[in-house]
Amino acid sequence: MADIALLWDSKLLFEKFFIEHGFDHQLIHPANMGSPFLPPFKMILIPTGFANPKYSNILPSLMKNKRRIESFITKGGTLLVFGALTDSHFYEWLPVDLEYSQVYGPAELHEKCQSNASLLASDPVQECDGFFCTNGGECILVNEKEEAVLVTQQFGEGMIVATTIHEFPNPEFIRWALDNSTSTAI
């Protein structure tokens, strides 16, 4: 049974990354969320560019499934979401206050708060596609301008991890997140 639901509307390199590191995953179109035929998952991963129609058309489905996403997190699932890849984006489909601003380039990262979520960044210098202007959670990593690039928010029994780091997550982070999540329906 798959541990990770990769929400997207076409094939992605993330699938190769998961296979290379031994993570069980399933590519799910967000329009299929709530289907009784989907297995439970420990993590939902939403890649960079989800709000940009050049890369994906999943944003309307995310908006429509706001309650399902909230329920998944509340019951112990982990949501890992990357940058919107638009000039700005309010994550209205999440149960937390989160606003994104796009600025692409390398960033020197510093830990603002101690958290195992910082495992996501394998190196202190990472490509980032922006920062979070507002966040209702805990700021874990910031860039050299003290702008948030990795934030977390406990919600119910689960967690939201939002990042603007524009690289694959460190496999250690995925293992940590899966070990600390509960399988639940989306």
Model-derived regions: residue spans:
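A structure-centric signal for secondary-structure junctions around beta-strands
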Residues: M1-A2, P40, E127, E157
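Short, Lys/Arg-enriched, disordered terminal segments
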Residues: M1-D3, A185-I186
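Helical hinge/lid and interdomain linker segments adjacent to catalytic or ligand-binding clefts
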Residues: D3-W93
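Catalytic beta-strand/loop cores that center a nucleophilic Ser/Cys/Thr
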Residues: K11, K16-H21, G105-S181, A185-I186
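Short, low-complexity, polar/charged sequence segments that are solvent-exposed and flexible
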Residues: D24-I28, I46-P47, M63-N65, E99-Q102, ...
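A glycine-rich, often tryptophan-bearing local segment used as a flexible ligand/cofactor-contacting loop or short
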Residues: A51-N135, L141, E167, S183
